[in-house]
Amino acid sequence: MFFENIKKLVQYGIDTGLIPECERIYTTNMLLEVFGEDNYEDTDISGQEIVLEDVLKVLLDEAVARGIIEDSIVYRDLFDTKLMNCLMPRPGQVQAEFAKRYEVCPTEATDYYYKLSQDSDYIRRYRVKKDRKWTVDSPYGVIDITINLSKPEKDPKAIAAAKLAKASSYPKCLLCVENEGYAGRVNHPARQNHRIMPITVNDSAWGFQYSPYVYYNEHCIVFNGEHTPMKIEKATFIKLFDFVKLFPHYFLGSNADLPIVGGSILSHDHFQGGHYTFAMAKAPMEETFEIKGFEDVEVGIVNWPLSVLRLRGKDSDRLIELGAHILDAWRGYTDAEAFVFAETDGEPHNTITPIARKVGEIYELDLALRNNITTEEHPLGVYHPHAQWHNIKKENIGLIEVMGLAVLPARLKEEMEILADYLVNDKDISSNDKIEKHASWVETFRGNYEAFTEENVMSILEKEVGIVFTRVLEDAGVFKCTPEGREYFKRFIKTL
């Protein structure tokens, strides 16, 4: 069984093109060394289907049985990455192949790289497949919802081991270029099967890679070669468009650079993009304006729950100039009546979540206006999911959510399943610790439906979760989608 699965793993590498046929013996010997095995017996695997997840499971069980690793998801993930490293081409080979294909066409290069990132098990397809995904109609278009299940939950043993592990500042964070080839440790994932594409944006060295958790098609991360903090400035817009010019089929956006309205990693300058059209990109402009000195740029308010200005034009340099002008104006903008304060007690509040894309021959720059002010009533943020929705979403509204994709916590999968049972069988929701937090939310929609049945209950819950996410996005909008809110928005635009 052991030798059979070693052979299957090598065959998988050949079948996917990770290794050539001429490296069969070499790769076999590398895998044997990882197991401390001196012997090898050839077996016949012809006609057998090779499923990577199954092959790795057998080999991981063998590693546990041999006492090489502890039987926990953290150690298993570290070890199977070590196994996959035996099948990986060197970074230089991957970069050369990418460059060769890029000469033909950028799409061919990214297709090759995206497939490699999955075949290598850096993107664990079998975990990503577990994510729950659905769409919901909203007043702003079709919203995407996903419950992320591909990030493994750490077990108590690994958490305890991580506390005892000696501190290491290498790599400095999960986005540093030093992750490429890193063996990992109990509190840092292994990245031996990871390959980074070096690119140049704004005349500086950056890296291009895919997210291991792919929230949407070809979800990529573009990060600074230096460990330097997030900062939204004019140079940000230059970098975004430099990337879009390299890969015109991809959009690229940045999280905001302030807490509450920013992403989870503010310590390392990075962007996220991909080959996907979000609801926000499809949303039309509800009204257009002319900005003095920028008459050649189309500017409009996007029909979207967050406060978004869209700039359109054939010359990206003009969008960059106008984007910088709007950013500067917004950073210093206060309108007490609209409850917008540029700063309180010296702490700045206004920033922007920008997204760049190319549509045909036209460049677009979407600027979502953000503000992170807090009050006693809303201690986590006035323009942040309000407390009544925290049963569904209380995390920051980052770039991905801004564009119309809800990334919801894994706990919701089980909670929705329990809720479904309670609704169908008319049980008391507040009697169950796991779902009592949803009781008042359920009462807001219970009366809208004649009956909850096993056939309709899950689609009802999915729809209602989508409605909550739309409300959450409205909470994050600085200028509301009301006549009054639109007047406040136009008041800001007039200052430009």
At which residue positions do the language-model features occur?
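Helical scaffold of the NTase/Pol beta-like nucleotidyltransferase catalytic core
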Residues: 193-197, 227-252
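Coil-to-beta-strand transition motifs
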Residues: 215-217, 249, 264-266, 279, ...
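Beta-rich nucleic-acid/ligand-interaction surfaces
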Residues: 259-267, 345-351
